[in-house]
């Protein structure tokens, strides 16, 4: 069983301390959310599960944690300055703004007016000035994805942790997109976290690795408690493919608001390393890339014959927040108790559960029992099990159900 509506999940998340509207006491900020005591535990556990499967359980992946502020050179060379945009439409009457794909028919969803502007590109990246003088000459972007920092660190990682193909670089971190219309709770927001792996392979083996990573990623979501019946694979084709992609498979999930992307696995070919490398003309780059005159590193690897080649890249990219939403939805249960009342129960996989253990004395006014419970809690905490709590309400049944 899953939640019947997004409203049920939103109400539960606020009531139980999972997720709150950001800056709520001042009216809130659209598209921004804060994780509460239980939410941050669930989120951290999901990230830890991903990191374990991608890095700790493999011999061919290294991890990094790169800066959020990203130079114009990086995002200009990658194509983000030119192409990282959504088509924007304005209503001439009520002044509301919409993504083109949100306009059903020819009328404004807000006021019903047919007086709409033609779609125009709206760049989704946030800018910020660097240094004490804000004259527009020195600025950086808040990164719109974690991937580019991985590509620009390709040589650093190889020099410090040598690998042969295939190998990968993983990262979990914040990204920012100035969404035109954030919506559906934490599904589409302006500040979010990504879990991304860039897996470098030899050209010619990329199709095989793309299939392999798609299978691995589907299985990982099943291991997090996602019901297989709630997952579909979407094979992106034609004009829907990103400019850098040879092939993309989206893992689609049945969220309360509908079937939407949970994770994408893209074959990015040699576009990214080819965009950021120096000596482009010597490297037989297959993708169409911008000429690079500023890069100081050759982002390539030598083959068996000592010839330089640029690896192809397979990228599994998942949103942490979307993952939290999917896991919450799957965990949602409604039960009818003895008095006929409905209660909501969350049934998480043990490794994701926000609370790992609860110590509950049978009697709240028994000093010896409470003291023993407190000592037991301390011993459990020393095991680094995770979040351990002491619940001393005296109502054993209610406390047991709560945790």
Language model: regions and residue ranges:
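NTP/phosphate- and nucleic-acid-binding module
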Residues: 1-403
């Amino acid at each position: 069983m899953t939640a019947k509506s997004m409203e049920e999940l939103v109400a539960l998340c606020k009531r139980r301390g999972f997720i709150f509207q950001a800056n709520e006491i001042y009216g809130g900020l659209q598209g921004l959310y804060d994780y509460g005591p239980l939410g941050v535990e669930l989120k951290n556990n999901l990230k830890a599960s991903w990191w374990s499967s991608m890095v700790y359980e493999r011999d061919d992946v290294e991890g990094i944690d790169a800066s959020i502020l990203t130079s114009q050179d990086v995002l200009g060379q990658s194509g983000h300055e030119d192409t990282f945009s959504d088509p924007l439409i304005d209503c001439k009457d009520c002044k509301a703004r919409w993504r083109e794909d949100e306009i059903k028919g020819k009328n404004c969803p807000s006021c019903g007016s047919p007086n709409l502007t033609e779609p125009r590109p709206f760049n989704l990246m946030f800018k910020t000035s660097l240094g004490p003088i804000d004259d527009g000459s020195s600025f950086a972007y808040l990164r719109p994805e974690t991937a580019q920092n991985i590509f620009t660190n390709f040589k650093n990682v190889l020099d410090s942790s040598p690998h042969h193909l295939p190998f990968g670089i993983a990262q979990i971190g914040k990204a920012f997109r100035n969404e035109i219309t954030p919506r559906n709770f934490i599904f589409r927001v302006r500040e979010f976290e990504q879990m991304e792996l860039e897996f470098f392979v030899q050209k010619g083996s990329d199709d095989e690795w793309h299939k392999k990573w798609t299978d691995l990623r589907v299985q990982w979501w099943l291991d997090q408690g996602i019901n297989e019946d709630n997952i579909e694979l979407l094979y992106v084709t034609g004009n829907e493919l990103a400019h850098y992609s040879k092939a993309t498979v989206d893992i689609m999930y049945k969220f309360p608001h509908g079937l939407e992307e949970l994770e994408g696995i893209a074959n990015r070919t040699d576009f990214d390393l080819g965009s950021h490398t120096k000596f482009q003309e010597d490297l037989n780059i297959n993708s169409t890339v911008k000429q690079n005159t500023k890069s100081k590193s050759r982002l390539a690897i030598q083959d068996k014959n000592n010839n330089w080649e640029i690896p192809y890249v397979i990228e599994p990219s998942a949103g942490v927040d979307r993952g939290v939403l999917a896991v919450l939805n799957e965990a949602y249960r409604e039960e009818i108790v003895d008095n006929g009342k409905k209660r909501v129960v969350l049934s998480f996989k043990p490794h994701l559960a926000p609370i790992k253990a609860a110590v509950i004395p049978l009697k709240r006014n028994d000093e010896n029992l409470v003291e023993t419970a407190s000592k037991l809690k301390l011993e459990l905490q020393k095991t680094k099990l995770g979040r351990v709590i002491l619940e001393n309400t005296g109502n054993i049944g209610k406390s047991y159900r709560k945790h």
